[in-house]
Regions:
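N-terminal subdomain of nucleotide-sugar transferases
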Residues: 1-44, 81
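Active-site proximal beta-strand in glycosyltransferases
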Residues: 4, 101-120
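Conserved catalytic-core segment of nucleotide-activated headgroup transferases in glycan assembly
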Residues: 22-25, 175-181, 185-252, 263, ...
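Membrane-proximal helix-turn-helix segments that form the acceptor-binding/catalytic region
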Residues: 126-145
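Acidic donor-binding loop of glycosyltransferase active sites
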Residues: 143, 275-289, 302
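Carbohydrate-associated surface elements
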Residues: 151, 173
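Short hydrophobic beta-strand element within catalytic cores of glycosyltransferases
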Residues: 293-296, 303-307
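A charged, aromatic-enriched C-terminal amphipathic alpha-helix characteristic of glycosyltransferases
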Residues: 342-368
Length: 368
């Protein structure tokens, strides 16, 4: 069994965002197939870990990102542990990763969740050109890079001339391996909890709401999509909004309670809501947005209506009729797609072959 060290630069347990959930589930399933040790921050609840060893070495404060004392500490851990490879989540610690490799010779992988500079450029950060240079340098030096999306991988290969032999797919995974049989039961449970009529369509939006791309998507629902839906006099529906971090200025969406909007806040079991939903709404127009939630929604049987930006990164060929895409800002077309969703269409089996965690880890092990 391979001995693998992984470094997560921020707290991910318990998880609240899609990125945190990705790391948590990736490590959980990787730990089942390798001898895994994870170094992360003191702010994690490692009592939730069951398949790997954890070391809370990184500081809680932002100074952890430039803590030069980590060079000696992680070098010692690598040498004493006899690890075969190290996986660094995100490129932020590239300066540290290659100093550790120089001292130990360990095979070094970067796990990138986005082309980071593009994400920060899209949200207006002035320093994106600096990050672009740093990120490109990081990719050039890595022994291997794991990409969430085929688009990101092709960008690195075509634009930054990264050797394709060093580029590997690592999509966001789902724990289920088949279309759920309990969707009706889950719908009834959610409907009872939120006083939803049996005749109502259930539309769902889920995401960390203090993340600007998600907040902008929520505003698109409130200001554009919902008003268009409400014009259809024969449509009975409710839109459930899930997620923590809603700004106080929106007052828990109380002003929209009489407009078919239900604010559920953070929910412990989001899979219940995915199974209950007829349609998941993904009107994201910048940044990373809700891509991870989109994969989960389709896995649990909901149909997703997404903008082009929102749908970027998902393997559309395996989604069948469970993914409908419109252009960004095309709210009339977006609304028409919602209205034209065919109820009851199953998720294709090919979707689970690609996105089930056990299948993902099986392929990933070959590259370590």
């Amino acid at each position: 069994m391979k001995k693998v060290l992984a470094i997560a630069p921020y707290p991910y347990l318990p998880y609240f965002s899609g990125g945190q959930k990705f790391i948590a589930q990736f490590f959980h399933y990787l730990g089942k197939e390798t001898d895994l040790t994870v170094i992360s921050t003191e702010g994690n609840d490692f009592s939730l870990v069951s398949s790997y060893k954890a070391i809370p070495l990184l500081k809680k404060s932002f100074s952890r990102y430039y803590d030069r004392g980590l060079i000696k500490k992680i070098t010692a851990i690598v040498k004493e542990g006899g690890f075969d490879a190290v996986i660094w989540e995100h490129p932020y610690y590239a300066w540290l990763a290659y100093r550790v490799r120089k001292r130990t010779g360990i095979k070094t992988f970067m796990h990138t969740h986005n082309i980071e500079y593009q994400r920060f450029k899209s949200t207006g950060r002035w320093w994106w050109p600096i990050l672009k240079w740093y990120e490109k340098s990081c990719f050039n030096k890595a022994d291997g890079i794991f990409f969430i999306t085929p688009e990101d991988k092709l960008f690195a290969i075509n634009n930054w001339k990264i050797d394709p032999a060093r580029c590997f797919d690592l999509p966001f995974g789902v724990e289920t391996d088949k279309f759920p049989a309990d969707r009706l039961q889950c719908r009834n449970e959610v409907a009872l909890k939120h006083s939803i009529s049996s005749n109502d369509k259930i539309y769902l939006f889920n995401g960390l709401l203090n993340y600007k791309p998600n907040l902008d998507a929520l505003k698109a629902i409130l200001e554009h999509i919902n008003p268009l839906l409400s014009k259809n006099e024969t449509l009975a529906y409710k839109i459930i909004i899930c997620g923590k971090g809603l700004p106080d200025s929106l007052n828990n969406l109380k002003d929209y309670a009489d407009k078919n909007i239900i604010y559920a806040g953070f929910v412990d079991d989001i899979s219940l809501y995915f199974k209950a939903a007829d349609v998941m709404l993904n009107p994201v127009q910048s940044g990373g947005g809700v891509k991870t939630k989109m994969v989960e929604a389709i896995a649990y049987g909901a149909t997703v209506v997404a903008t082009e930006t929102g749908a970027a990164g998902i393997e559309k060929a395996v989604c069948g009729s469970k993914l409908l895409i419109t252009g960004d800002n095309e709210w009339a077309r977006f609304t028409n797609c919602i209205l034209n969703v065919e109820p009851g269409n199953p998720t294709p089996a090919e979707f689970y072959t690609l996105y089930n965690w056990e299948q993902i880890i099986k392929k990933l092990k070959l590259s370590l």
